[in-house]
């Protein structure tokens, strides 16, 4: 089970994400029991995770970027990043060695297909993030709006992807636990390695995910509050 540490970065600082309510995000030091800094490199130096997922909240919301920091982060840990990709040329903005995450909140299905094909030509692959809120798909593509996430998972099966992230923003930072009915259906529907983001509250959830066949989990809150040992991400 891949335990991937999450860095939500806004205006150069790591913030505590809660239920996708971005206006209320606060520096991670106001929440964490573990870190003394919200500066990304300093935080990584303290926690030493092997693998990280970075959400560049500035790029996702169209207000600046944290690309320099992402490049530096990739020198300290294996890195995947969501930079709000909405055009094929956005792939070129990512620093080398960083795996692109194509989130449905900003990327259309046609863009996801084009990006997967382009990356395959260069021997690399992207991850797709199925972005949801309260179980409903968040989609920039009008053609995806209202589509069932399980149906979308099936429609991605023909693509050459590194994996698919299931990210329900309503569960992010909330330690709500697992929707086992949905997750079992997702595991059955997808041919790709699946990674869950949002809601994981402790080690028992990681064990349940592994039993369902998930490849990994995005972790932040449960690490910062001590419910999941730091050793899991190191």
Residue ranges and their predicted role:
Residues 2-9, 52-54, 79-83, 100-102, ...:
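Hydrophobic faces of well-ordered beta-strands that scaffold small-molecule active sites
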Residues 9-29, 96-172:
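Conserved anion-binding
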Residues 18-62:
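N-terminal beta-alpha supersecondary unit
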Residues 32-45, 88-92, 144-155, 206:
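Short, acidic/polar
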Residues 43-94, 180, 184:
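N-terminal active-site wall of soluble small-molecule enzyme domains
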Residues 48, 76-79, 93-101, 119-126, ...:
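Glycine-enriched alpha-helix->loop->beta-strand junction motifs that scaffold or abut catalytic
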Residues 64-71, 142-153, 176-184, 234:
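Charged helix-capping and loop-helix junction motifs
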Residues 88-90, 97-114, 168-171, 198-232:
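Glycine-rich phosphate-binding active-site loops on the catalytic face of alpha/beta enzymes
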């Amino acid at each position: 089970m891949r335990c991937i540490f999450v860095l939500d970065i806004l205006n150069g600082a790591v913030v505590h994400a809660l239920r996708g309510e971005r206006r209320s995000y606060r520096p991670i030091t106001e929440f964490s029991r573990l870190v003394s800094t919200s500066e990304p490199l300093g935080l990584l130096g303290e926690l030493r995770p092997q693998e990280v997922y970075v959400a560049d909240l500035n790029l996702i919301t169209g207000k600046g970027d944290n690309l320099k920091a992402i490049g530096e982060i990739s020198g300290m840990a294996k890195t995947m990043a969501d930079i709000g990709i909405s055009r094929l040329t956005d792939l070129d903005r990512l620093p080398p060695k960083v795996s692109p995450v194509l989130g449905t909140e900003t990327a259309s299905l046609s863009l996801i297909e084009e990006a997967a094909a382009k990356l395959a030509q260069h021997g690399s692959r992207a991850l797709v993030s199925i972005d949801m809120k309260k179980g409903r798909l968040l989609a920039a593509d009008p053609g995806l709006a209202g589509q069932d996430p399980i149906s979308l998972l099936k429609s991605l099966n023909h693509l050459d992807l590194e994996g698919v992230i299931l990210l329900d923003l309503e569960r992010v930072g909330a330690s709500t636990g697992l929707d086992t009915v949905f997750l079992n259906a997702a595991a059955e529907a997808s041919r790709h390695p699946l990674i869950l983001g949002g809601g994981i509250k402790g080690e028992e959830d990681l064990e349940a995910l592994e039993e369902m066949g998930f490849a990994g989990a995005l972790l932040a809150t449960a690490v910062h509050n001590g419910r999941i040992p730091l050793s899991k991400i190191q």
